[in-house]
Amino acid sequence: MSREQLVNRMLCSEAMLDAQKLRTGELDDNDWAELIRHMGPLSEAPIYIDDTPGVTPMEVRSKCRRLKVEKGLGLIVIDYLQLMSGNGRTDSRQQEISEISRSLKAIAREMEAPVIALSQLSRACEQRADHRPMLSDLRESGAIEQDADVVAFLYRDEYYFPDTEKKNMAELIIAKQRNGPTGTVDLTWMGQYTKFGNALKKF
C-alpha cells in the first residue's frame, strides 16, 4: 500500500468518513468539514511513512537510527514482513523470513521501541471448518512465533459466513503473550471507515 493510500485510510478512520466516498469524491459539505478538521492534527502527528519496496532489515535499522536521532521513535510498524528482503545469503525463503524476524527483534531492542510486524497467513485456516487463525498458520516460518513477544490475529465471522449473527463484529485473538494471558477480545468492525472499535456491551 502506498503512502497516499495509507494517509487516506487514516483520514477516513479519524474523520469517520466512508472510504468509498473519498475515493470517488462524493463528499457533501459536512464530509468536507470533517475531513478538513481532522487533516490538521493528522498532518502534525509524529507519523513517518516509508513505502520503499523490498527493504532489508539493515535498511530499516539505518532509517530507524536516523529517525530516532532527528525526531524520536516510539513505535515501528512493518506492513508486512513477507514483503521485506533478506541479505541474500540464505538458501530458502523460510530461512530468509527467520533471519528477518530475528533482525526485527534486534531492532526493537536497539531502538528501545516496540515493533509491530504484520504477517501473511498460510491457506490452512481457509480449509478448516473453524477459520480462526492459529499460530501454526503464520506463513513461511515458525521463527515468527518464536521471536514474537505477542502474536495477535484478527478474525471476522461475517467474512466467511455472510448470514452470521455476528455482523460488524470482529475478534482480536491473542494467541501468544510472553508476559501475560492469552484470550479473545471482541471488537466492533466499521468497514466503511476501515476502523475497529470497542465492542458495544449488551445489557
Language-model features and meaning:
Residues 1, 118-120:
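Conserved H-loop
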Residues 1-72, 86, 184-188:
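Cytosolic-facing regulatory segments adjacent to core modules
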Residues 53, 82, 121-123:
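Active-site-proximal loop/turn and secondary-structure-junction residues that shape catalytic pockets
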Residues 8-10, 88-90, 128-130, 164-165:
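Short amphipathic alpha-helical segments
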Residues 22, 30, 56-75, 102-112, ...:
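C-terminal regions of RecA-like/P-loop NTPase motor modules
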Residues 49, 79, 116, 149, ...:
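Residue-level signature of catalytic and energy-coupling elements of molecular machines
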Residues 50-51, 117-118, 154-155:
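Conserved beta-strand segments of the P-loop GTPase G domain that flank and frequently precede/overlap
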Residues 73-117:
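Helical hairpin unit composed of two closely spaced alpha helices linked by a short loop
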